[in-house]
A protein has these predicted regions:
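Glycine- and acidic-residue-biased ligand/ion/polar-headgroup-sensing regions
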Residues: 64-65, 69-75
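Conserved short histidine dyad/triad with adjacent acidic residue
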Residues: 47-61
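Short beta-strand His + acidic residue motifs that chelate non-heme Fe in jelly-roll/DSBH
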Residues: 59, 77-78, 94, 100-106
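Structural motif
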Residues: 43, 74-76, 83, 99, ...
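A short, N-terminal "cap"/entry segment at the start of jelly-roll beta-barrel domains
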Residues: 1-43, 127-133
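Short, surface-exposed secondary-structure edge patches
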Residues: 58, 67, 82-85
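Double-stranded beta-helix
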Residues: 12, 43-45, 103-133
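Short acidic-glycine-tyrosine-enriched beta hairpin
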Residues: 81-96
Length: 133
């Protein structure tokens, strides 16, 4: 089963570009070039992100709860007046409908996000992992 999931995961790599994706309140191309892979079930989603250095996902919010786990290097998050620096092995929970900003500084980062319910912004296609197994 794991090999099927891995193949499905890797075959759905797409490049994130603001002109093709709509994040609420996002009016900049600063996150262009970030890549993600996504797989989803009926009510849960997992995304794997490769984010270049000096990338900014401007202040936004979404209905989904988000858990981010940093795999490599570091990511920065800000919500309200509070900023967080997450290094490899750190994770953060962002409740749904909370304004937040995410960015990298001098180095790229790699992270996994878990979403519930599915965040439609990062939906790759209509075929769920459950249908593939």
């Amino acid at each position: 089963m794991l090999s099927v999931a891995k193949l499905f995961f890797m075959n759905n790599k797409i490049t994130y570009r603001n002109s093709n994706q709509n994040i609420e309140n996002n009016n900049s191309d600063s996150c262009a070039g970030s890549e993600f892979w996504s797989m989803e079930g009926k009510n849960v989603q997992l995304t794997w992100f490769d984010v270049p250095a000096n990338t900014n996902f401007p202040n936004h919010k979404h209905d989904s709860e988000q858990i981010t786990y940093v795999l490599e290097r570091e990511l920065f998050f800000k919500s309200g007046d509070t900023a967080y620096r997450l290094a490899k092995g750190d994770c953060i929970l962002i409740p749904g409908n909370i304004d937040h900003e995410v960015w990298t500084e001098k180095s790229s980062a790699r992270a996994i996000d878990a979403w519930s319910p599915v965040n439609k912004v990062y939906t790759v296609n209509k075929i769920s992992l459950l249908n593939k197994l």
